[in-house]
Amino acid sequence: MAPPKHVIIIGAGAGGTATAARLAREGIKVTVVEKNNFGGGRCSLINHNGHRFDQGPSLYLMPKLFEEAFEALDEKIEDHVELLRCHNNYKVHFDDGDKIQLSSDLSRMKPEMERIEGPDGFLRFLDFMKESHTHYEGGVEMAIKQNFETIWKLIRLQYVPALFRLHIFDFVYSRAAKYFKTKKMRMAFTFQSMYMGMSPYDSPAVYNLLQYTEFAEGIWYPKGGFNTVIQKLENIATEKFGARFIYEAPVAKINTDDKGKKVTGVTLQSGEVIEADAVVCNADLVYAYHNLLPPCRWTTNTLAEKKLTSSSISFYWSLKRVVPELDVHNIFLAEAFKESFDEIFTDHKMPSELSFYVNLPSRIDPTAAPPGKDSMIVLVPIGHMKSKTNEAEDYTMIVKRARKMVLEVLERRLGLTNFIDLVEHEEVNDPSIWQKKFNLWRGSILGLSHDVLQVLWFRPSTQDSTGRYKNLFFVGASTHPGTGVPIVLAGSKLTSDQVCDHFGVKVRPSAITSSKRTYAPEDSKSFIWDIIWFLLIALFAATLVLFIAFPQYSEVNQTAASYINNLLPAAFRVPVANLSLTS
């Protein structure tokens, strides 16, 4: 009997851990190498004197995708993780002192919507939710659960109606503006694009699906912190399926055999070489192509030009007492809403007026802080680093300015004084720290951006995008399907299925039955007809462009039609008189 295939996974983040568990379940030997002495990547914890902070994600959204990640391992998530539902979604604070409580309880939303939007405000809110539901259902099934390995998968005619239903070519803010009359509600229902690290003015409207999942499925919190989910996946991978995790093992390079068009394993910074039949990279994709692989034109030209998401200054404050004015999730929005996003995403700097997010996990999970105290996280979105080094930015001064601005807003909008006196201890992540700690390219906390030309087939592939290495795969925020923990977990299925297919391993069906929907298998005849139709449409479009762009072939007084006509064999030419410019 042949020995099992060996796969090395670089990085023990959400994607790497879930992929390790999936592959190990299929009998593949899996070794995970992680640079840090902890797992989870950005889904890791900071602890200090009884205070616990989620270093990265704190909003447990799209719960079905989490359930599916555990079901694929023949497990139920409720047997491993205790989920706590937030009574309120957010408390949103505006610059004029007004605030609104967003809740998935419609009986509470109705008076809030009518107070700000007028008598028909609640009905327009329901219409917005109806459209967002379409985005959610279509977006998950088409964009998240499908792997666009070739352009042919993208151009299938069955997807054309979906592109319009999902408003791919419209933007989050402009769609919200069709339903909400007031600036306050437009802001309250578009700031969620920051979960994708994007401006609502540039983010494809399909990402309004985030608002739907918040209201329809609720916002949850895993007891013990977000890292609990990843830790449980690791436990399943190691204890149930025999995967191996090695910590404090940073990778120096991915070893390659260019003649054989394959990778052969990794070399650790310690000098140790670990051989493998395939490598899955869960390290930041842009970092990996620039630092772990030989240079190539695609990396230096194509990848280097792709847009990045924002970074953040994140404060982790241990508070002396509970602050009752704050809820679990709090949003403070700048009056100069659009201008602040322009400064983040166009100028790549900290905005002059801050919008920021405040999370108090201790409000929903008392184990996050000592009795009578709060653990408080403040996330301030700012532009990513302008270069690989932080030479252009003085983050010591930028952090100092951000702290001062946050405190001023908190005190003014909450009616408090000397808020800084409540802070017993502070830890900070700025863009340079995000880059150093997690190898995030230019400190971009959510990887590559998700504009129209950086999603689906246009996003870096789950299999080596350069075409050089047939056994090199990727999982994580910057590859398809995209960023966010639930989306990355869904992506782990696409990647692991691809690896199994590469080895000729058939994925066993889950022992856990689920009602989740899946697309029907591809019909090969339908696929061929899609290609034929695409070629015909492309030919028609090319001809139309010629007729519009080149109305006259001036040297011989010909039209574009007559010029093309002359290129045809004589038997196929149209009589010249029918194509003449003059009567």
Curated annotation (Swiss-Prot):
One of its GO terms (biological process) is carotenoid biosynthetic process. Its EC number is 1.3.99.30. Residues 1-20 form the signal peptide. It is a single-pass membrane protein. GO terms for molecular function: oxidoreductase activity, acting on the CH-CH group of donors. Pathway: Carotenoid biosynthesis; lycopene biosynthesis. InterPro entries: Amino_oxidase, Carotenoid/retinoid_OxRdtase, FAD/NAD-bd_sf, Phytoene_DH_bac_CS. Its main location: membrane. It is an enzyme of class 1 (oxidoreductase). It is found in: Membrane. Its cofactor is NAD(+). It catalyses: 15-cis-phytoene + 5 A = all-trans-3,4-didehydrolycopene + 5 AH2. The chain crosses the membrane at residues 531-551. It holds the Pfam family Amino_oxidase. It comes from the Eukaryota. GO terms for cellular component: membrane. Keywords: Carotenoid biosynthesis, Membrane, NAD, Oxidoreductase, Signal, Transmembrane, Transmembrane helix. Belongs to the carotenoid/retinoid oxidoreductase family. Phytoene desaturase involved in the carotenoid biosynthesis pathway. Converts phytoene into 3,4-didehydrolycopene via the intermediary of phytofluene, zeta-carotene, neurosporene and lycopene, by introducing up to five double bonds into phytoene. NCBIfam families: crtI_fam. This is Phytoene desaturase. The gene is carB.
